[in-house]
Structures are given as C-alpha cells and as structure tokens.
Amino acid sequence: MNTYRTAIIGYGRMAHGHAKAYQEVGLPLVAVADISEEALARFRDQFGQRQMYTDYRQMLDEVHPDIISVVTHDQLHCPMVVDAAERGVKGIVCEKPMAMTLKEADRMLTACRLSGTQLTISHQRYYTPQYAQARELLSSGAVGAVRSAEAYLLPSCIHTDGTHTIHMLLSLLSNPRVLHLLAQVDGHSGHVYYGHRVEDAGVAFIAFEQGIHAHLNWGLASHQPRTPLHPSPDFRYHGFIIHGETGRLELDGDGPVGDRPILRIVRGTEIEAVNLRPGKSSIRLEIEDLVSSIETGAPHPLSGQNGRDVLEVIIGIYESARRRRVIQFPFEVKENPFLAMCEAGDFPS
C-alpha cells in the first residue's frame, strides 16, 4: 500500500474515530482544521502536534493532503467535498448523511467525477460483524427468498441518524430498486439537530422491485415523557426483521437486548443464534477500502453514488409527507422538503 497523507476537517465527537483509524491503517495524519481553537487543542492533547488550521481551505491549499475526512455538520458536507475535489484530493471520507438535498449530492458527485476523486459516505455500520453476517445469511438463502422487511430507529430522525437505517435496509435487501413509497412525518416540536430542524417521528412504506416491500418506523411519540413511536422497541438504535419464504432474520442493531442473541434466524418456534466473528474498527475498514479504490479504481462499497441512493429515499419520504401522496421513483426534487414544510409553517406546535 502506498503512503497517503491525510487530514481531517472538523474535529468533533466522530472525528476522533477517523483520526484513530488513520493511525491504525498506518497513514500519516498531517493536519486538522476546525473553526474552534478548543477543538484543535483537544486534538493536540489526544494525538499530538500537527499542522492546525481554523480555515479548511487554507489547510487544503497549504498541506495538499491525499485523503481527507469531512466530519462536520450536514449543511457543510457539499461545499467542503467540492472544495477538496477541486483541489485534487484523491480520496474523501464524508460523514453521513451525504448532503441536505439531492442537488447538493449531484454537485458533489460531479466534482469528484471531474477530478477523479474517490468519495465515500461513512455508513460505516456496513462493516460491523452483525450487519455483515446478516447480509451474508440473506444472500445465501438462510430464510429463503426475501418477501418483506421491518426497520426501526429510536429515537432520532430519518435524515441524520436514519440514513444508517435506510442504508442498512437497502444493503440487507441487496440494494433493490425502489419503485415507490408513501410516508408521513411529525415535526411539531421544532427540534434542532446538528444545526437544522429535524422531525420527531415518522412512518414509511417502501415498495421495491421483485415484489419486496418494507415498513419503517422511527422517532418519539412524545418528548416529555420520552415515549417511542413503536410500542416495544426491543433493539439498540436500529432494529431489523427480514421476512423470507422459510423464516425470518432478526437483528437487534448496535448491541444485544438482555440475554437475547443480537442476530438470529427464526423458523416457526425454533430460534437459531448466530455467533458473530470478531471485527475490526469499521472506519478503519472503510479507509482501507478507500485506499484500494484509489489504487485500483474499483468502486467503494460506500461510494458517493451509494450515498446518493440512500439520500434519495430520505428525500422521497419527506416529499411524500409534504405532498401527501405516493412518490414514484425516480423523481425530481432538488430542495429539502422537510425544511420547506418547516418554513411554510406546516408543523404547528
């Protein structure tokens, strides 16, 4: 593996994992940029002195990193990715969600295509053992042909955290083409998350090719007291049930619930626990695949186009809620329908 000089834009909570992963892969981390001097001092305390910047463009112009991580609020992903691509960065790890709108996502993809930059969107749970083995089991026919799926998210919104839920649902189903969806969201509380308004709860029905359909359920029925929309959320952060012809696969998300196996196959009254393999850091594996994509040109499992596909489902959910109708795929919506609904006063408190 060649040596690539790396840098990080935005040093918040998630950025520590990126910095550690670069060290584990053996790539020199040469610079970090953040508008907060306090954040830069925290990085220095954790990883030692590097080139420090409060202006990310200045860092890109002076350091010329080969690979960067964009670990900032959602609204900043597009301009930062475009600026890096236009300056010749070879690889970009962009935190999820990809962007605020499909227009921004398309701008990012175009900039990276023109510069030859490999872009990956950090849906890193793709690499964790329970999700990787769940994909393998479904692909091998462990429950027969897949017919339907249930996906759950607690407590957050479909855009900022549910992007993981959508991504994992699509990957568990082998990325089928979306035909149409119908959805509704509740945004009455005015909750702000990572710098922008988000919904409190929502539901969606998605129809895929090959006759597969999925139901999504996320968020809170109330904040005080905190009451989940789903009456019995026995999962950790995300939860999935995949129904097949001969059984179902159940996945409890990011951690076990009580003594129950986190991943299991259910056939009638029989429950088969799946033993999980040891796993490496998911961000480390994402970066290793990015290096491989840079050197071989092979598509990354978490490519920018894959990230756009996930964002299209999210925007479709918001557009269905705004228009109160079924949304056929593909569609042309360049704004963020949820934010448009907020600006129009569609969510009275």
Question: How would you label these PLM feature ranges?
Answer:
Residues 194, 210-286, 303:
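NAD(P)-dinucleotide binding in Rossmann-like oxidoreductases
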Residues 128-148:
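Rossmann-like NAD(P)H-binding beta-loop-alpha module
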Residues 49-56:
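Conserved SAM-binding strand-loop segment of SAM-dependent methyltransferases
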Residues 1-47, 169:
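N-terminal Rossmann-like dinucleotide-binding module
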